[in-house]
Structure formats: C-alpha cells, structure tokens
A protein has these predicted regions:
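Helix-to-beta-strand junctions that scaffold the AdoMet/dcAdoMet cofactor pocket
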Residues: 91, 151-153
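Mobile active-site "lid"/loop adjacent to the S-adenosyl-L-methionine
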Residues: 116-146
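S-adenosyl-L-methionine
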Residues: 77-118
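Conserved SAM-binding loop of SAM-dependent methyltransferases across substrates and taxa
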Residues: 54-67
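Conserved class I S-adenosyl-L-methionine
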Residues: 44-53
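Non-catalytic substrate-recognition/targeting regions of SAM-dependent transferases
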Residues: 1-27
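Conserved SAM-binding motif I beta-strand of class I
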Residues: 68-73
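C-terminal catalytic and target-recognition region of SAM-dependent MTase-like enzymes
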Residues: 142, 156-217
Length: 217
C-alpha cells in the first residue's frame, strides 16, 4: 500500500486517504449515499460535522455548496487529512477544524451561542455489543440533545449510528428523545443506510449496522 495519503474522489469532493494508518480503509465508503443526501441540504449552509474523521460529511457539504464547515474530531491526524482534502477540493478557505472531545466541543459551542444550518454527528459505535446497548442508547440520546441545541430554527440535524446492537427503532427513539429534551420540535425527513457496496445479508444481522437519520428542526 502507498506510504503517503492518496486522493480519492467521492460525491464531488476529494478525500485524502491513509491506506496504512487510517481507520478501516481510511475512508468510509458505506456512508457515501448519506454524504450525498447531506450535501443536498447544504447549499449556502453553515455546517458542523462532528466525529468528522477525514471530513466525510463536511467535505461533501462543501461540494454541495455549503458556505462554511467546522469539522470536529479527536484525532489530529484525521483532521489534518480533512484539511488536505479541503485544499485539494478547492474549498480550503471555507473549511475549519477543531480537535477535541466531541461532547466538550458541543458544550463549548452552545455556551458561545453558536448556531448552524446543518449539524451532522457520525460517532463511533456507542453500542458495539448487547451488554453495551443501554449505555450506548443513553450516549446517542445525549449526543442528539446537545447537537439539536446548535441547529438554527428551520435547520437540519443528521444523526448516524454504526452500532448493530442498536437497531433502527431503538436508535430512532433515543435520537427523538434527545431532540425533545433539547426543547426542539422535529420532523424526520430521511432515513439512510449503507451504500450498495455494503449489502445487507438477510441471515447476518450484524451486516445491517449503519443508520442515518435526518431531521428538520
């Protein structure tokens, strides 16, 4: 495999991919259709991409015409690749990164009065097994509550889960509870899953792991 990051095009954006040191293959192709849907909501929008990794949703949003993107992740290496991807996509001036714990950054942004037209959260698996399910659902609810408070009236919130133990119904319920506890009314406008290159095996529940919920608030 190449030792240096390589550019990969997806949904009109360029992603810099570390094939050796990156998570999985360095880029999350399973999210491709959900990136594309988010991009449709992003024209002219100020976007917050939380747990951004190498810029998955944020760079897709800029390709869709977003005015500005703030990408938040705990990995400095991933954020550097995201920045390189923004430069390679010709949108470096509209792209900003912030390294830190996602929940802490969300709290800081709320305290500062920040608001966004589109907020997307794509965390790692909070419920990676059945024993972790209840704690994971509480984490999804907390994330939804904190993220919802940063969405402008009439804006959009995207919430993702890659936890196969948290099925769609449980994840959706936790997300809706969190949004409600933020004092926000919501309408679920889209439910997304993994792309066709990550098919679901009818006899393997673990293959139906990815869910993406998009709400209008």
């Amino acid at each position: 495999a190449p030792k240096h990051p390589i550019p990969v095009g997806m949904n009109g954006a360029v992603y810099m991919t570390d094939l050796q040191g990156g998570q999985k293959t360095g880029i999350f192709y399973d999210q491709r259709p959900n990136h594309a849907f988010a991009a449709k909501l992003a024209k002219g929008a100020r976007v917050l991409d939380v747990f951004s990794h190498v810029g998955g949703f944020g760079l897709a949003a800029l390709a869709g015409g977003a005015s500005a993107v703030l990408s938040v992740d705990g990995s400095a290496a991933a954020l550097e690749l995201a920045h390189q991807g923004a430069e390679a996509s010709g949108v470096g001036a509209q792209f900003e990164t912030r390294k830190g714990d996602a929940f802490e950054v969300l709290g800081t942004l709320a305290e500062s009065g920040a608001r966004f037209d589109l907020v997307i959260c794509d965390p790692p698996a909070f419920a990676s097994s059945k024993p972790a399910l209840e704690a994971g659902l509480r984490a999804y609810e907390k994330l939804a509550r904190m993220a919802a408070s940063l969405v402008q009236e009439g804006g959009y919130l995207g919430l993702c889960s890659c936890s196969h133990a948290a099925d769609l119904a449980r994840f959706r319920s936790a997300s809706i509870r969190g949004i409600g506890r933020a004092g926000r009314a919501s309408a679920l406008i889209h439910t997304g899953f993994s792309g066709p290159d990550h098919p679901v095996h009818p006899h393997l529940a673990e293959s139906s792991y990815l869910k993406a919920l998009f709400f209008c608030l």
